[in-house]
Amino acid sequence: MAFAVASQPDQARPAESELASSSAAAQYITDSCLSDGPVGRVGLEVEAHCYDPADPHRRPTWGEINDVLKSLPAMPGGSVVTVEPGGAVELSGPPIDGVVPAIEAMTTDQTTLRNAFAAAGLGLVLLGADPLRPAKRINPGARYRAMEQFFKASRTGVAGAAMMTSTASVQVNLDAGPAAGWADRVRLAHALGPTLVAIAANSPLLGGAFSGWRSTRQRVWSQLDSARCGPVLTASGDDPGTDWARYALKAPVMLVHSPEAVPVLHYLPFADWADGRELLGGRRPTRHDLEYHLTTLFPPVRPRQWLEIRYLDSVPDAIWPAVVFTLVSLLDDPVAADIAAEAVEPVATAWDIAARVGLGDQRLYTAANRLVAVAAERVPAGLGEAMQRLVTAVERARCPADDFSDQVIENGIRATVTWLARGDP
C-alpha cells in the first residue's frame, strides 16, 4: 500500500456487528471508496523478479530472500520492502508530493535494494512475467496459501499460480481528487489502460516459452474471473462509487478470517452472504469482513480512497520513470487529461488487443503517439533522456517486450536473464 496501511485482523479485535444487508454494504463501499481532496501526491510500487545469476532456473528460497531483507538498511526514499508469493521483491513507496520527487525516491530505493541483493549473489529483474521458471509459491503466508487453494477450487489454478508467482508490475497510486471530478478521473484512468498496456508491455515469455502476447502478464489476469479481476467501469461509467459497490458485491468471497485466512471453496457472491442467503461460520459478514473482501479484488484500477493504477508491466529502469510520468501527467494535468481522453476514446476497452499485439494495432499506435507527445511537452529536464527514449520507441511501434524478445532470440532465455540479473551494462 502506498497511501495507507490497512489494519490487520487480530484475534483480540473487538467483536463487530453484522451488516444488515447487501444494501448496507453497498452504502458503506460507496461512501468510503474515494477521498475528496486535491490531486498531486504520487505513490509508486515496483516489483522485480529475484534470480540467482549463477543458475537462473533456480528460484531463490524464502530463507535466502529473508536473509537479505534482515540486513537491509532503512530505505532512503521511505519505501517498504515486501516479498510476493513467488519471491518477487516489491518496493512500496510512500505518497510524495509530485511525480518527479516520487520517481527520484523510488530510484534511490531501487539502488539500495539492488546493491543488497547483489552482495548476497542475487539479482533483481524488471519484467512483467517470469520468462524462465515454472510457477511456484515460496512465501509461506496464510493468505497466499489460501488464495492458491481458492484458485484451484475455482478452476483457475494455473492462471492463479502464474498471477501470484510469475508476474510483476509497476503500480501508480494517485489521489482521487475533488469529488466533482471523480467520474471523469476514474473513467480516464480506465480508458488509458489499453494504450498504456501497449506502451509498457514487457512480458512476451512465460515459463520458458514465447506466449504470443506482448503482455503475458495482462493475458494471465484476463484468464482469471472477470468478476474479481476485470475492469470495474466501462468507458462510460458515470458513478465510480456505485460501480465499485456493484462490482464488489457481485464478486465471490475468496477468503475469510478464522482467525487466519481461510479459502471459500464454493461460489458465494458477497451480496448473498450479506443478505443472509448463505452464512459463513454461522453469521453474516461484518464491516471488517467487507473491508477484507475488497482487498481480494484485483481490477486494473482499484479505488482505495485513492486510485491504484495496476495495469502496467514491470519495465526496465531506463524507461519506467517516463512511463510513470506519462500516466501521472495525463491524469493530473487538466489540459493533458482532456487531450488524452479524446486520444484514447477509440481504444478505451481494447485490453486484449493491447496485450496481444501492443503498438502493432494502428489505433493503439495512434493513441500512444499522442499520449507520449503530450507528456513530452511537460517533462522536466531530469527526465528528458528517459522520455525521449520512450517517445522514440513508441514512434517505432516498439514496446519493452520487443527489445527483450530480440535479446532472447539472439542469446537465448537463460543468457538474457543472467545478463539482466547481473545488471550488466
Whereabouts are the PLM-identified features?
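Terminal catalytic/cofactor-binding subdomain
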Residues: 1-160, 166, 201, 305, ...
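Non-catalytic surface loops within mature trypsin-like serine protease
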Residues: 52, 176-178, 313
